[in-house]
């Protein structure tokens, strides 16, 4: 399959630069997987679409202020984007500089350049950085870091983004991008869903900067997926198996929840799904056999991205591309701060190719 098969025209004006004032008031495009039928509504329509006993699976990762600015002690300006925290002193990061720093390079970080760090090793495209500071890494990032808004939002981060670019249920710091489908859930909607009898479970996948990297090959089968850390604990496994046993649906909130659950299913030796704690490089594209997910809540993704490929594998290529064409025509808002989709599984998707 060609990467260009997953391209579509998107006017710049449809890229959302700010979220809706009220999280759950975004628009919702519903796609019926088996038929391709589309319906238009608002996000709170989920209350009518979900049944008592259905299981929503959320990703409870929390975005860290992962973008740092500063300079090398020798003078050149740098921008650091944390990929992951290795421990209380070290990070793995992307570094933008006119000349890549060598091991041993001293870095001065923060607006006042008061934080001292050393680039200690290089791992492919990533740099290992150790802070020379008594505080834990997370405290340093909270003090001097900027929220790592995606490039397409195309504005400096603001103080408000520290909360707006987090889900209301975020709990475990470690992501450099929000699991954006979850941004639409507010406390009143969560309470209403619970009252209806909708079950909830929480996985953790720390979204890495690789999620924004373009696919740089022509044929998608040649793409090497970036690695991200995921946790699917026993209580999530139990909730999934219980929902399946009683004939209810498992609904993933966002592609990161999909990738977590499907990673746990792939690694399972005897049951449908088993606990999973580790790095995943799962790459889902048309032809993939979904094992766990019955429905998906997700935002609108970038052209030619691995995420639109994941959606195509779930809903079917033609249904997905038609939905995106309709969304553009109907002026839905796209990407991280944009509108959402509710998609049910298309069993024919596995045999469909572009």
Swiss-Prot record:
Belongs to the QueA family. Its EC number is 2.4.99.17. GO terms for biological process: queuosine biosynthetic process; tRNA wobble guanine modification. InterPro entries: QueA (IPR003699), QueA_dom1 (IPR042118), QueA_dom2 (IPR042119), QueA_sf (IPR036100). Pathway: tRNA modification; tRNA-queuosine biosynthesis. GO terms for cellular component: cytoplasm. Transfers and isomerizes the ribose moiety from AdoMet to the 7-aminomethyl group of 7-deazaguanine (preQ1-tRNA) to give epoxyqueuosine (oQ-tRNA). Monomer. It comes from the Bacteria. Pfam families: Queuosine_synth. It comes from Salmonella choleraesuis (strain SC-B67). Keywords: Cytoplasm, Queuosine biosynthesis, S-adenosyl-L-methionine, Transferase. This is S-adenosylmethionine:tRNA ribosyltransferase-isomerase. NCBIfam families: PRK00147.1 (NF001140), queA (TIGR00113). It catalyses: 7-aminomethyl-7-carbaguanosine(34) in tRNA + S-adenosyl-L-methionine = epoxyqueuosine(34) in tRNA + adenine + L-methionine + 2 H(+). Its main location: cytoplasm. It is an enzyme of class 2 (transferase).
């Amino acid at each position: 399959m060609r990467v260009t098969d997953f391209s579509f025209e998107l006017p710049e004006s449809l890229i959302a630069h700010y979220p809706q004032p009220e999280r759950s008031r975004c628009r919702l495009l519903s796609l019926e997987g088996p038929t391709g039928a589309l319906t238009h509504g608002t996000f709170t329509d989920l209350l009518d679409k979900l049944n008592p006993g259905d299981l929503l699976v959320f990703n409870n990762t929390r975005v860290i202020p992962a973008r740092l600015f500063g300079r090398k002690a020798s003078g050149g300006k740098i921008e650091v984007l944390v990929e992951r925290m290795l421990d209380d002193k070290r990070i793995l990061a992307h570094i933008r500089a006119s000349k890549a720093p060598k091991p041993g390079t001293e870095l001065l970080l923060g607006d006042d350049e008061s934080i001292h760090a050393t680039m200690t090793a290089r791992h492919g495209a990533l740099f290992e950085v150790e802070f020379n500071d008594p505080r834990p890494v997370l405290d340093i990032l909270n003090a001097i870091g900027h929220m790592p808004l995606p490039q397409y939002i195309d504005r400096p981060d603001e103080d408000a983004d520290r909360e707006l670019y987090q889900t209301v249920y975020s709990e475990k710091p470690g992501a450099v991008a929000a699991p954006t489908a979850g941004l639409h859930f507010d406390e009143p909607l969560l309470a209403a869903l619970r009252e209806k009898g909708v079950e909830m479970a929480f996985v953790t996948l720390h979204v890495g900067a690789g999620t924004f990297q373009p696919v740089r090959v022509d044929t998608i089968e040649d793409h090497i997926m970036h690695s991200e850390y995921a946790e699917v604990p026993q209580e999530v496994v139990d909730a999934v198996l219980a929902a399946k046993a009683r004939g209810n649906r498992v609904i993933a909130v966002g592609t990161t929840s999909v990738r977590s659950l499907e990673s746990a299913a792939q690694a399972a030796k005897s049951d449908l799904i088993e606990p999973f704690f580790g790095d995943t490089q799962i790459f889902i594209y048309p032809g993939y056999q979904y094992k766990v997910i019955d429905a998906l809540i997700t935002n609108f993704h970038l052209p030619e991205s691995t995420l639109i490929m994941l959606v195509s594998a779930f809903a079917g290529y033609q249904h997905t591309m038609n939905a995106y064409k309709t969304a553009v025509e109907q002026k839905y808002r796209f990407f991280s701060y944009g509108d959402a989709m509710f998609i049910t599984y298309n069993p024919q998707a596995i045999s469909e190719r572009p």
